[in-house]
Design a protein with these regions (language model features):
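Short, hydrophobic/aromatic-rich segments at coil-to-beta transitions
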Residues: 38, 68-73
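Structural motif
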Residues: 56-57, 71
Length: 127
């Protein structure tokens, strides 16, 4: 999808009006870097609201990127899908929510953890 880009807008102090149009904005080009490895998934739940990911949002996920500690990922723990912040350190692997109402998932020896991709963008509608 391509849409007209109407310049920039100040989010702090007002800036002089810009009377020109930028080149068309291609949302696929903006959001999808590796089409063959990218999928979209709709969020169900509020465990990541502190990271700006809300119920009903659409996540852009790249399967080709390996997770690094601190990345938001899509994973399956014992067959249950989740979106969480991936943490790996000497204490092992854990999946952290961005909402204190939800528990941290600590991966125990023998527990099944499957990685499905790194979240690269979140599409959030205001209305």
């Amino acid at each position: 999808m391509k849409a007209k880009m109407s310049g920039t807008v100040a989010a702090g102090f007002p800036s002089p009006a810009e009377q020109y149009l930028e080149p068309p904005l291609d949302l696929n080009e903006l959001l999808v870097k590796r089409p063959a490895a990218t999928f979209f998934v709709r969020v169900s739940g509020d465990s990541m609201i502190g990271a700006g990911i809300h119920d009903g949002d659409i996540l852009v996920v790249d399967r080709s990127l390996r997770p690094a500690s601190g990345d938001v990922i899509i994973a399956s723990v014992d067959g249950e899908f989740t979106v969480k912040t991936y943490r790996r350190d000497r204490g092992g692997v854990r999946l952290e929510p961005a909402n204190p109402a939800f528990p941290v998932i600590r991966i125990k020896p023998g527990q099944e953890l499957d990685y499905f991709g790194k979240v690269t963008a979140c599409i959030h509608r205001f209305a």
